[in-house]
């Protein structure tokens, strides 16, 4: 009789432990368990970094079943978010992309700024060159301006306005961002004279000693004005998924944090693995974002 009773007690205790463990596992995901999210990555370095970090934290800390990062482009991403094909795009530069945002503003919601600072972009040179201004670039030995994707706003401005304004004799080279950065790395190591499209925030500002060239004729126009980085979500997301909405609205990085995140990804050679390594090393940065998501459950 005692053995039978002891067996029942042991089974009851084991069942209690299993239920408790199940409760804890459910509690980790809470209201996020089973949820999915679709976010955009247009291939810009900061977009990739933020999107992959969002995926890592929502899946591993908040409990989402899957966050899918979709390859997109600037020409279609706004419409895709507005139509609900994508839930969010986290690399909106304002005022640079104001015209794109205006076309869908009734169908999307803009979140809080995700970058604690202002951007900078233009043509840069390594600091070992003596050139400080665009009107003196022809006096250097640089024969190339290493560029990025031809569809980018900055490339269009360089081709249509900057080169004619200064009579620049350098060839403007079109390439992917990764291709340009590989060429910058090679030429910088060889201490060659060259110019290239540069912007901040980006890990290049941490890796290279570079100088943004002055633009006395204001040929870059509005691109000379500092921009802010924010995110947009489909108008239905705040109601359909308040957890993801709260997380992305709370997400914010300063210049050092974003440069460090991008550098970690670059060194890892894989965006997802790099984002995971950065998250492991910087819990104090992202814990408020996760807390905001948990509070919304």
Show which residues each predicted segment covers.
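Ligand-binding cleft/hinge of the Venus flytrap
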Residues: 54-63, 141-173
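A ligand-binding cleft/hinge motif common to bilobed small-molecule-binding domains
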Residues: 90-104, 186-213
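Short helices/loops that flank or line small-molecule/ion binding pockets
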Residues: 52, 57, 75-89, 178-197
């Amino acid at each position: 009789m005692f053995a039978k009773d002891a067996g029942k007690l042991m089974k009851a205790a084991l069942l209690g432990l299993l239920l408790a463990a199940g409760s804890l596992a459910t509690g980790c995901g809470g209201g996020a368990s089973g949820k999915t999210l679709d976010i955009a990555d247009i291939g810009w370095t900061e977009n990739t970094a933020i999107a992959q970090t969002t995926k890592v934290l929502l899946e591993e800390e908040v409990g989402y079943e899957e966050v899918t990062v979709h390859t997109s482009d600037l020409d279609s991403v706004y419409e895709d978010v507005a139509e609900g094909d994508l839930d969010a795009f986290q690399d909106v530069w304002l005022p640079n992309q104001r015209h794109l945002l205006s076309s869908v503003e009734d169908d999307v919601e803009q979140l809080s700024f995700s970058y604690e600072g202002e951007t900078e972009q233009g043509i840069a040179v390594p600091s070992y060159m003596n050139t400080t201004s665009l009107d003196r670039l022809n006096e250097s030995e640089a024969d190339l301006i290493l560029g990025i994707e031809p569809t980018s706003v900055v490339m269009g401005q360089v081709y249509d306005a900057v080169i004619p304004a200064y009579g620049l004799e350098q060839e403007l080279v079109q390439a992917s961002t990764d291709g340009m950065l590989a060429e910058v790395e090679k030429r910088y190591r060889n201490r060659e004279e060259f110019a290239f499209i540069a912007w901040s925030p980006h890990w290049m500002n941490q890796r290279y000693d570079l100088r943004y060239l002055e633009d006395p004729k204001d040929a870059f126009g509005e691109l000379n004005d500092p921009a802010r980085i924010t995110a947009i979500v489909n108008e239905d997301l705040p109601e359909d998924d308040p957890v993801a909405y709260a997380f992305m609205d709370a997400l914010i990085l300063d210049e050092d944090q974003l440069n460090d995140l991008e550098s970690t990804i670059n060194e890892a050679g894989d965006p997802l693995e790099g984002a995971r390594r950065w998250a492991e090393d910087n819990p104090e940065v992202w814990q408020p974002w996760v807390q905001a998501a948990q509070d919304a459950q």
